[in-house]
């Protein structure tokens, strides 16, 4: 009986040792560069392509819009935009990514927080008209807190570009045509 127990332990120990080893990319004690290299080495081309995809929450009018359905969402996608009002759904989607994807890579949740989230502030062009970077810092600080509390990881802002052509559709997201003012307001935003 004793020999059988020793044999069982000898067979079981190597198996337990292998099972307890985490992949390098999951080891927070390793340098980031090494973790990234390890993760990229493990990823298939398909997984890498899906990490570059951003699906949209809301209308279900094209294949990259999930509507309000989670079941058809690939677990390996990189990010999802416009989901900030339902923490249960966000957690369900994140759990799907972590548990159903092969490598357990979490999804980034993004939203356009260019001039506030729950509290809406004047557009960037109007903020620049105030010539008050401190006020911009205060407003953006509140927007940042609201974003964190809403589970948003990625805010797509500020938009630091110099407005050159008034026909451009996103000119209102700029801080204007003066590079110095754009720089000051951009620094205040960040």
What residue ranges belong to the model's regions?
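N-terminal beta-rich core of secreted/periplasmic extracellular enzymes
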Residues: 21-190
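Bacterial Sec-dependent N-terminal signal peptides
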Residues: 1-23
């Amino acid at each position: 009986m004793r020999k059988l127990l020793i044999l069982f332990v000898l067979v079981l120990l190597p198996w337990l040792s292998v099972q307890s080893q985490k992949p390098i990319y999951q080891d927070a004690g390793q340098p980031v560069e090494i973790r990234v290299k390890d993760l990229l080495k493990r990823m298939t081309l398909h997984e890498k392509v899906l990490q570059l995809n951003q699906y949209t929450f809301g209308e279900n009018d094209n294949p990259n819009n999930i509507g309000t359905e989670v079941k058809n969402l690939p677990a390996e996608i990189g990010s999802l935009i416009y989901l900030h009002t339902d923490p249960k759904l966000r957690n369900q989607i994140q759990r799907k990514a972590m548990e159903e994807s092969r490598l357990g890579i979490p999804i980034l949740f993004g939203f356009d927080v260019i001039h506030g989230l729950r509290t809406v502030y004047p557009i960037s062009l109007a903020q620049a008209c105030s010539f008050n970077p401190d006020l911009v810092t205060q407003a953006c600080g509140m927007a940042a807190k609201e974003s964190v509390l809403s589970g948003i990881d990625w805010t797509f802002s500020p938009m630091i570009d110099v407005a050159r052509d008034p026909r451009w559709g996103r000119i209102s997201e700029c801080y204007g045509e003066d590079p110095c003012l754009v720089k000051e307001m951009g620094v205040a935003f960040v």
